[in-house]
């Protein structure tokens, strides 16, 4: 589960894709 704004964070954006 990814929180909103995680996609903007390079440390978490990889989980957004």
Swiss-Prot record:
Q: Does the keyword Cytoplasm apply?
A: no
- PTM sites of type Cysteine amide: 16
Q: Give expression by tissue.
A: Expressed by the venom duct.
Name of the protein:
Alpha-conotoxin ImI
Q: Which residues form the propeptide?
A: 1-4
**Coiled-coil residues:** none
Q: Which residues form the signal peptide?
A: none
Summarizing the annotation, the consequence of altering residue 15 to E is: No loss of activity
Q: Name one GO cellular component term.
A: host cell postsynaptic membrane
Lineage, opening ranks: Eukaryota, Metazoa, Spiralia, Lophotrochozoa, Mollusca
| Assigned protein family | Belongs to the conotoxin A superfamily.
Q: Which species is this UniProt entry from? A: Conus imperialis
Post-translational modifications reported in the UniProt record:
Not hydroxylated. Hydroxylation improves its folding but impairs its activity against target receptors. C-terminal amidation facilitates folding and correct disulfide pairing.
């Amino acid at each position: 589960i990814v929180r909103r704004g995680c996609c903007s964070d390079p440390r978490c954006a990889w989980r957004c894709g």
